[in-house]
């Protein structure tokens, strides 16, 4: 009986380890070719809006908000290694920061405590009404970085265009990103 339990536990553990071999986005492993991965995103309701040499853009809803997804892949093998969620722009710093804090809380529950850098530098300070100018000029950083054994997740605020900022979440699969870098190095 003990042997059966040990064997079953070993099999279960190997399934769990296999299932967690790649970082996921919306429960879709960040793995496979662009066509395979994009087909899964289309099935989840996203629409392709652009195809470029190293990324494919899709539009849809994530966490109840309109966004653009940027699916990054290896130029050599077309293997997907990262997904960027770029939320639609916002003008209101308070709303943007609130969204950032809510998403950071959820990511912290899922991935653990992040490395955080949230600051305005002189001559700017939070609440002075110049948040966009501070971000545009490099006087502000708002980023939470989560590191796991299988990948990296970053949540950050960036300026988008005149007087607008946006919230971005990046999901990078460690294994496929390293594979992509090696493929590029092999080309040199």
Where are these regions (language model features)?
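Alpha-helical interaction segments
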Residues: 8, 27, 136-137
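Boundary at the C-terminal end of the N-terminal hydrophobic targeting segment
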Residues: 19-21
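A cross-family detector of function-defining hotspots
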Residues: 33-79, 84-188
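Periplasmic/extracytosolic POTRA-like scaffold domains at the N-termini of outer-membrane
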Residues: 25-32
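Sec-dependent N-terminal signal peptides
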Residues: 4-17
């Amino acid at each position: 009986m003990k042997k059966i339990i040990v064997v079953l536990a070993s099999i279960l553990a190997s399934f769990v380890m296999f299932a967690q071999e790649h970082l996921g986005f919306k429960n879709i492993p960040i793995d496979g070719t662009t066509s395979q991965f994009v087909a899964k995103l289309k099935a989840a309701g996203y629409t392709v809006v652009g195809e470029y040499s190293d990324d494919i853009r899709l539009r849809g809803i994530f966490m109840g908000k309109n966004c653009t997804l940027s699916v990054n892949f290896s130029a050599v093998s077309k293997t997907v290694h990262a997904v960027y969620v770029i939320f639609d722009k916002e003008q209101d710093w308070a709303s943007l920061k609130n969204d950032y804090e809510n998403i950071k809380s959820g990511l912290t529950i899922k991935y653990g405590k992040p490395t955080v850098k949230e600051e305005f530098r002189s001559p700017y300070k939070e609440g002075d009404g110049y948040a966009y100018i501070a971000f545009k000029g490099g006087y502000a950083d708002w980023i939470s970085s989560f590191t796991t054994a299988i990948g990296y997740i970053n949540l950050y605020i960036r300026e988008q265009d005149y007087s607008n900022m946006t919230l971005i979440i990046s999901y990078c699969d460690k294994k496929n990103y390293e594979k992509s870098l090696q493929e590029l190095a092999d080309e040199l």
